[in-house]
Swiss-Prot record:
Modifications after synthesis and translation: Phosphorylated by ATM following DNA damage, leading to stabilization and translocation it to the nucleus. Ubiquitinated. Deubiquitinated by USP13.
Name of the protein in its database record: Ubiquitin carboxyl-terminal hydrolase 10
Family: Belongs to the peptidase C19 family. USP10 subfamily.
GO cellular-component term (any): early endosome
Organism: Homo sapiens (Human)
SUPFAM superfamilies assigned to the protein according to its UniProt record, in alphabetical order: Cysteine proteinases (SSF54001)
Amino acid sequence: MALHSPQYIFGDFSPDEFNQFFVTPRSSVELPPYSGTVLCGTQAVDKLPDGQEYQRIEFGVDEVIEPSDTLPRTPSYSISSTLNPQAPEFILGCTASKITPDGITKEASYGSIDCQYPGSALALDGSSNVEAEVLENDGVSGGLGQRERKKKKKRPPGYYSYLKDGGDDSISTEALVNGHANSAVPNSVSAEDAEFMGDMPPSVTPRTCNSPQNSTDSVSDIVPDSPFPGALGSDTRTAGQPEGGPGADFGQSCFPAEAGRDTLSRTAGAQPCVGTDTTENLGVANGQILESSGEGTATNGVELHTTESIDLDPTKPESASPPADGTGSASGTLPVSQPKSWASLFHDSKPSSSSPVAYVETKYSPPAISPLVSEKQVEVKEGLVPVSEDPVAIKIAELLENVTLIHKPVSLQPRGLINKGNWCYINATLQALVACPPMYHLMKFIPLYSKVQRPCTSTPMIDSFVRLMNEFTNMPVPPKPRQALGDKIVRDIRPGAAFEPTYIYRLLTVNKSSLSEKGRQEDAEEYLGFILNGLHEEMLNLKKLLSPSNEKLTISNGPKNHSVNEEEQEEQGEGSEDEWEQVGPRNKTSVTRQADFVQTPITGIFGGHIRSVVYQQSSKESATLQPFFTLQLDIQSDKIRTVQDALESLVARESVQGYTTKTKQEVEISRRVTLEKLPPVLVLHLKRFVYEKTGGCQKLIKNIEYPVDLEISKELLSPGVKNKNFKCHRTYRLFAVVYHHGNSATGGHYTTDVFQIGLNGWLRIDDQTVKVINQYQVVKPTAERTAYLLYYRRVDLL
């Protein structure tokens, strides 16, 4: 090539054609070196490896083919340009010699219509008559001159696939039948191509430049030696045909059976597959990414066969083609050997025993109902269902019926919670619950089900908190203490990656909580009650599956019924079923009313009882037992400075004046509250938000001292249980504190301090920030934050 370098005449190209066909890899041409006679076109080889009928010639101007002595120099070469089929004078010195089809062999002909050999690209049924018709209609080298005289522009190979990205001449999205666009669409098929396709028998499925051979969306490209067989029946319908075939029902059968098969990878913007009578929306179906299934015939009518290993030809370059649809495909995670469209399943070549083979069924069969549904179908089925319609509910109910609460502390690796909204009151509460050992062990005891295993649920709150607890794992390595200033020992801790518990936030809307209302004050104590009551109610519903008789007992059950309607108590009378006469100290009798309590694991952790006794002259004492999850402590009085003061104020006797009975007589009554049952986990609520008569709300900024070790004195207990509780049953230890920051009752921020057993110290968690603090910082009063919720555990359960 040093003596006579070939010259290139590119002809008249538009700017977009120049950019598309000369800048991209598809616009390159490689030529053999000059050796006295300019050789153009392709070369026929009689015997090719692996039984191929033709030899693939690669083009690229940046490559030079080494001269070969075995290169035959016969005048039967025809000119075929992949750059511009209208230019037979593309290479200087190469003239378009008109050679009749009888003078050449089918291996030596290179059709400009499909950029491939007609003998191998079109003869799907192996008919030599079809090959003759193809050669006659194509005209081979003579066809170039005819098209030049017609002055009708023939688009080069891959023109329409490049226009998928945009352009004025781009066609609308439609189905491709084996790579062909519908001839009714303008600019899709020229008049000559329509005439050429019309002369072909129905069994022949030609390829066009729109279905390139060297493309990653073709199975036969990735495995060059193992393409699909081409024997298509006359009654076969392809994926792109509008009706009467499996392609029309692609939406109903696009996903194969789940058992024994690989799930189908979908595009990033996967749309629901819907059968239609037009070809306008079927382009998306053709753009669906498919995997080769491990079994026989898939439900869409395409039978795929795969082998254990596929040998790729390293000598043949692979060129990536643009995705078939505009949504973009998630092909980054797919293996290279997967077809990307339905049209790629029908690319023709000679079959081989070591490659995926696709067969198209010739008879239409009704689509099978696939157990694997699409994502949008799953979303339709998601939601709350009754426990009777939830097959997993009975399994959870049996587990909870026999559960044993474990109070053993566990060392968990702390993780912050990302707050992208006003979720600090939720995050602070969640961190305190994670630090509660019996709560953690309970949720870890319940299995974690995926959406596939349980698309519909009757226990959304249980599911969410089981998932939350599974986000936390044991501390990997105990942190080593390091020496700091003085004799202090500071421990380092490595928290895990922060995450956003969006599934917890969605519970507010799923259960239609008032906390989800916009413009409403977010309150950590109210959210804690929402969680505990919700978990309790779901567990009650599960108990109904095992004991339907408990259904009538859940009407007044739960800590929600704090207030006592005294008029209703009088209307019930002394003969009510939920009251009895109880003899107290000094032989005093009292009528006790109690709601029907049904125990759940939640009440076994947080549930306590208070006794409210009403004293009235000339009448028996009237007592009512009420359950609670959080003990409400009034701190408004100036005399209350500590938690002990607030507890004593809770049990103090208060008088009520002006009470009128049914006889319209004014009598004096008094009321006293005592603790009937203490829970294993005692949550104290310091009532800092006081509602005024005008409707406003103010925050009490006063500091309330709270100890790390809290002892409940006997004077706080009910008379009947004073002597039944030992000191260890009345002593609690602090393990979590929820703080409220700010001076306003309608705003502010929430943080949490939790005790970490592995660290044997305290952590301060502010959303996703986690840092180590000492115990003094937990109980020390500060102006910027005030304690709002105090979490205590019984010391005998530590």
